[in-house]
Curated annotation (Swiss-Prot):
The lineage of its organism: Bacteria, Bacillati, Bacillota, Clostridia, Lachnospirales. Gene3D superfamilies: Enolase-like C-terminal domain (3.20.20.120), Enolase-like, N-terminal domain (3.30.390.10). Pfam families: Enolase_C, Enolase_N. HAMAP family: Enolase (MF_00318). Coiled coil: none annotated. It comes from Lachnoclostridium phytofermentans (strain ATCC 700394 / DSM 18823 / ISDg). It is found in: Cytoplasm; Secreted; Cell surface. This is Enolase. One of its GO terms (molecular function) is magnesium ion binding. Keywords: Cytoplasm, Glycolysis, Lyase, Magnesium, Metal-binding, Secreted. InterPro entries: Enolase, Enolase-like_C_sf, Enolase-like_N, Enolase_C, Enolase_CS, Enolase_N. One of its GO terms (cellular component) is phosphopyruvate hydratase complex.
Amino acid sequence: MKKLLSIEKVKGREILDSRGNPTVEAEVILSDGSVGMAAAPSGASTGAFEAVELRDGDKGRYLGNGVLNAVEHVKKELSEAVCGRNPLNQVEIDAAMIDADGTENKGKLGANAILAVSLATAKAAATAVSLPLYQYLGGTNARTLPVPMMNIINGGKHADSSLNIQEFMIMPVGAKSFSEALEHSTTVFHTLKKLLKADGYVTAVGDEGGFAPKFNSDEQALEYIVEAIKKAGFEPGSDFYIAMDAAATEMYDEAKKIGKEGNYLFWKSGELKTVDEMIDYWENLCNKYPILSLEDGLAEEDWEGWKKLTERLGSRIQLVGDDLFVTNTNRISKGIKEDISNSVLIKFNQIGSLTETLNAIEMTKNQGWTAIVSHRSGETEDTTIADIAVATNAGQIKTGAPSRSDRVAKYNQLLRIEQELGQAAIYPGKKAFKVLK
């Protein structure tokens, strides 16, 4: 009789992310010799309701950012929780680790430790059954490649520039395939670089690979992007749309610091706006530019404001909740009940396990909303999010610029998946967006 597959050993180690900060990597070894390895990413602009990323706090080591305690939890408590269990039962594995932690926000053992083991288990299980990860998780229906939401200009917390808006992205909706979408986007990226250089701007890149020029205003960034799309030979508002991540919670918090609670401070330019002025501002930008998606247009605590924003712009553009929902089904279901936003950004480490991530995607899609699988600003060479995007047929991925290996690794994995799927591969283009009827 064939021996049942089980988890035999779990290893943990401290490695570096793309910002030079330590993160947790886990390695799961199965009874048949199959191995899975995964690393936890890390964010710079984080939501208050995210699961806890455990850091050592020892200022004498990595300026307090070490993760040796989290690594110890991988080797001890989490290893004890999962060893001997069947790796093909992901739900049970994740539940065992969540129980071992015993807190609401994974604050005892760390979401970074739990997530690394969770993803490594899925990878080991996929290897054991000789399937690529996207197929192991998604079955034969996993064949939709995502439209990239490609970051080409960085601002906010992600860059030392004068831009308040954190990310300006392009979406190649007019392409016929993922590989063509990547080629078109990269052409726009290089065209933008030429334009910036010609006008004397520095073309150094931010955390996510986009340029970080010292522009005078956020609108200037949009002007340059529209020009780059045209100069590259494409049509703005047809071949390409623009997406923005305002990371407005940062603006809300900055206003609080100067005693203007409930308002929004564009801290790099000094402008203070009320909720209604913020909504007017976003609407004006949408009227002027081919904007299709706005992420975190208001703060994570501002549910009333979000309601107004959704009423005003929800039928026109994709309104994405990131800090608002933090990949948490409790918060997503509140958003659904209150009809707030129409899209959810999905980040594994906000919730801290694969099962909970997949549940969040399922809940979002069942509502008829869009789900965007996303990286963090602190990434590694780990490409799991590429497989998850295809496994869940999410239709959209946010994983930075076509520069920096930590970002490009995900695009390259999607190219491999597309080639492997062959004729079965689907690139949704405009169909990925509910608002583009």
